[in-house]
């Protein structure tokens, strides 16, 4: 661990037990555990959410749910996070951790293509975290900005 990484770890709150369990299960049960956001990225996402105070969040790419749980922890009461995962084999793991979390009621898990699901959710999002299929990033951007002949899914300044 280099000096910067050590500094970050020394000045970051400890990982919550539920997230630690999810990290371990992800490493044991998935073929690509490196896709997990992890503790430091999760804390950073939570901080962004606390700073922005969004009412509606869209996450593209749930994986096993670590980043969704992290962001949900930063949401104000009454705010919601919609997370979209294309791989239906990950649904059970993610949903089981959402169900166990005190913030799980803020999370709505959708299985399928974000390009189909996100526009169908209606309304605009105040914050979007894209961590899905990297090849589809240009399509996600066009969808969010309304460049596909649809209404934009993000407001000005989002």
What residues fall within each predicted segment?
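A short glycine/serine-rich beta->alpha loop
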Residues: 30-35, 56-57
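N-terminal auxiliary segments of SAM/dcSAM-dependent transferases
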Residues: 1-19, 24, 29-30
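A generic structural signal for ordered alpha-helices
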Residues: 23-27, 35, 122
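S-adenosylmethionine/decaboxylated-SAM
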Residues: 39-158
